[in-house]
């Protein structure tokens, strides 16, 4: 089973349009299930996009996907660019992350047992290679590097960006803690970032939501093509590090 975390536009390519609510011990998650293609679409911000990044119930979302039998997750994340050569309209495939969040529930192991999950390769290496091959096949421009996750919902200041650009390549608000929670449940996770704007201080203008939404709309068909190719890839048995992530991570 494949999980897609993204927006309502992706529902167009699924065979199934009935929204379902999945109850978990961490809360509820809203999904659309395409049983024919074994795909689950999860709306990160809610069906009406009314949940801000810092209020998303990340644990309920990831746990719901696990409960439904999802093994591989493709997450769609909108980001701002920290580098001039990573232009709005390009894609970005993270290979690492740095996070500056403050209030998020970020682990499934607050009690019961102590788990130190390895984050040497936080994004599934197998899925990253597959995603890059799909982007290459479609001749879609993309970059690779470090995703910086901030708390939101505000945009970052110029001084913050001046620091972040020394450490990372793009900045966003939704990529963490999804990536860690997925690894804790031994699921494969990869992120397809769509670059919507230059970050504050990189851009010569003030940042607006209209600018972001306009670029998302402009990239929508490309995003849908990548998602469709990912769904139809024809995955075999998992041979990556993700499936055994807890093997050497649990104390006691």
Swiss-Prot record:
Residue sites binding phosphate per the record: 8, 44-45, 174
GO molecular function, one term: S-methyl-5-thioadenosine phosphorylase activity
Name of the molecule in the record: Probable S-methyl-5'-thioinosine phosphorylase
Family note: Belongs to the PNP/MTAP phosphorylase family. MTAP subfamily.
Residues involved in substrate binding: 173, 197-199
Further details from the record: Although this enzyme belongs to the family of MTA phosphorylases based on sequence homology, it has been shown that conserved amino acid substitutions in the substrate binding pocket convert the substrate specificity of this enzyme from 6-aminopurines to 6-oxopurines.
EC number, UniProt record: 2.4.2.44
Primary role: Catalyzes the reversible phosphorylation of S-methyl-5'-thioinosine (MTI) to hypoxanthine and 5-methylthioribose-1-phosphate. Involved in the breakdown of S-methyl-5'-thioadenosine (MTA), a major by-product of polyamine biosynthesis. Catabolism of (MTA) occurs via deamination to MTI and phosphorolysis to hypoxanthine.
UniProt keywords, alphabetically: Glycosyltransferase, Purine salvage, Transferase
InterPro entries referenced in this protein's UniProt entry, alphabetically: MTAP (IPR010044), Nucleoside_phosphorylase_d (IPR000845), Nucleoside_phosphorylase_sf (IPR035994), Purine_phosphorylase-2_CS (IPR018099)
Pfam families according to UniProt: PNP_UDP_1
Keyword Transferase attached: yes
GO cellular component: cytosol
Enzyme class: transferase
Gene Ontology BP annotations: L-methionine salvage from methylthioadenosine; purine ribonucleoside salvage
């Amino acid at each position: 089973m494949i999980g897609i975390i993204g927006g309502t536009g992706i529902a167009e390519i699924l065979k199934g349009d009935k929204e379902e609510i999945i109850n978990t011990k961490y809360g509820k998650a809203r999904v659309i299930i395409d049983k024919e293609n074994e795909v689950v679409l999860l709306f990160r911000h809610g069906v009406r996009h009314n949940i801000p990044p810092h209020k998303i119930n990340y644990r309920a979302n990831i746990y719901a996907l696990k409960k439904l039998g999802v093994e591989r997750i493709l997450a769609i994340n909108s980001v701002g660019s920290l580098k001039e050569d990573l232009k709005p309209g390009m894609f970005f495939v993270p290979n690492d992350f740095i996070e500056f969040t403050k209030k998020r529930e970020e682990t499934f192991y607050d009690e019961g047992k102590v788990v130190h999950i390895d984050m040497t390769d936080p994004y599934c290496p197998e899925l990253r290679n597959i995603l890059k091959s799909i982007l290459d096949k479609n001749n879609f421009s993309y970059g690779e590097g470090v995703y910086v996750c901030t708390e939101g919902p505000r945009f970052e200041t110029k001084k913050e960006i001046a620091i972040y650009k020394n450490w990372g390549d793009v900045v966003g608000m939704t990529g963490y803690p999804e990536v860690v929670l997925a690894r804790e449940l031994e699921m494969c996770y990869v992120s397809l970032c769509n670059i919507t704007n230059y970050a504050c201080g990189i851009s010569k203008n003030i940042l607006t939501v209209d600018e972001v939404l306009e670029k998302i709309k402009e990239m929508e068909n490309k995003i849908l093509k990548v998602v469709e190719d990912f769904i139809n890839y024809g995955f075999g048995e998992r041979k990556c590090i993700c499936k055994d992530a807890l093997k050497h991570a649990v104390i006691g």
